[in-house]
Amino acid sequence: MLVITRKKGESLLIGDDIEITVVKLDDGSVKLAIDAPKNLTILRKELYNEVQEENKKATNFNPSILKNIKSK
């Protein structure tokens, strides 16, 4: 893991087309601006983890519950 120190207004580059800029520093939080291609999905890690967990739940389907459905 790379750890970088940045001040307000300073940026870092990832590859040729992603720039992350420190916009605001508050007590205990940092606001970042991310300039990246529109085709790139950017998610907060906690949201990503939530989506992954929901996907796991969705694949945990029990086909035996279909036996309770009556057909006409």
Curated annotation (Swiss-Prot):
UniProt-listed Gene3D superfamilies: Translational regulator CsrA (2.60.40.4380)
Pfam short name (any one): CsrA
InterPro entries linked to this entry: CsrA (IPR003751), CsrA_sf (IPR036107)
SUPFAM superfamilies: CsrA-like
GO terms for cellular component: cytosol
Subcellular location field: Cytoplasm
Biological-process GO terms, alphabetical: bacterial-type flagellum organization; mRNA catabolic process; negative regulation of translational initiation; regulation of bacterial-type flagellum assembly; regulation of carbohydrate metabolic process
Keyword RNA-binding in annotation: yes
A Gene Ontology molecular function term of the record: mRNA 5'-UTR binding
Residues of the signal peptide: none
Keyword vocabulary terms for this entry: Bacterial flagellum biogenesis, Cytoplasm, Repressor, RNA-binding, Translation regulation
Assembly and binders: Homodimer; the beta-strands of each monomer intercalate to form a hydrophobic core, while the alpha-helices form wings that extend away from the core.
Function: A translational regulator that binds mRNA to regulate translation initiation and/or mRNA stability. Usually binds in the 5'-UTR at or near the Shine-Dalgarno sequence preventing ribosome-binding, thus repressing translation. Its main target seems to be the major flagellin gene, while its function is anatagonized by FliW.
Family: Belongs to the CsrA/RsmA family.
Protein name: Translational regulator CsrA
